[in-house]
Amino acid sequence: MLRLDAELNKDTISKLKKPLGKLYPHFEDAIEEIKSSEFLISVGDATFNNLTKYELYPDIGIIDNLIQRKNHNHEVIKAENILKAKNPAGTITDDLWETIGQAMKLSGDGNCHVIEVDGEEDLAVLPCILMASDETTILYGQPNEGLVLLKVCDAKDYAQNLIDTFIKE
C-alpha cells in the first residue's frame, strides 16, 4: 500500500476545497443514507459529534479534538479502541497511514474505533479512500457548507490522482 510523508501543493489545496462526494447542507438529510452504510468512516470532530448525537457510531472515527480550529473535547466516546497518530496540518504522514491501516484491521467487529490525531485530521479522507473497500461510506464536514457523504467506489481514482500531486518531503 502507498505510504508517504507528503505535503500539499497549491493546486491540490484548491481541488480539496470542493466536496469529493454528495454535499448535504443539513446533517439530518443524510441520516437514512448513513444508516444504510455497510462500513462507515467519519473524519472530523463535528461529523463525529453529529453521528453520536443520533447514536450512530462509525466503524472508524478520525478526530483531532478541534472544530474549526477551536478546542473541543468529546465528553463520551464509545470506542473499543482509541488509536493515536501524529499528522501536522497540510500533510499525510506515514504515522497517519499506518494508524488508519491498523484501525481498518481492527474494525468490522461492530465496534467504533477512534483515531485521535495530534495535529490535523482533514486530509485523512484521502488515505481512507485508498485503503477502504469499495462498499465503504466516508463522511466529513465541508466548512460552512455541510456534510459530505462519499462512496469510496466513486472516489478511488480521484483520490489517487490527488495523492500523486503531493510534494514528497
UniProtKB/Swiss-Prot annotation:
UniProt keyword terms in alphabetical order: Coenzyme A biosynthesis, GTP-binding, Kinase, Nucleotide-binding, Transferase
GO molecular function, one term: GTP binding
Family annotation (Pfam families): DUF359 (PF04019)
Catalytic function, reaction form: 3'-dephospho-CoA + GTP = GDP + CoA + H(+)
Superkingdom of the organism of origin: Archaea
GO biological process, one term: coenzyme A biosynthetic process
Pathway the protein contributes to: Cofactor biosynthesis; coenzyme A biosynthesis
Residues spanning the membrane: none
Alphabetized InterPro entries for the sequence: GTP-dep_dephospho-CoA_kin
HAMAP family for the chain: Dephospho_CoA_kinase_GTP_dep (MF_00590)
Annotated protein name in UniProt: GTP-dependent dephospho-CoA kinase
Organism of derivation: Methanobrevibacter smithii (strain ATCC 35061 / DSM 861 / OCM 144 / PS)
Organism classification: Archaea, Methanobacteriati, Methanobacteriota, Methanomada group, Methanobacteria
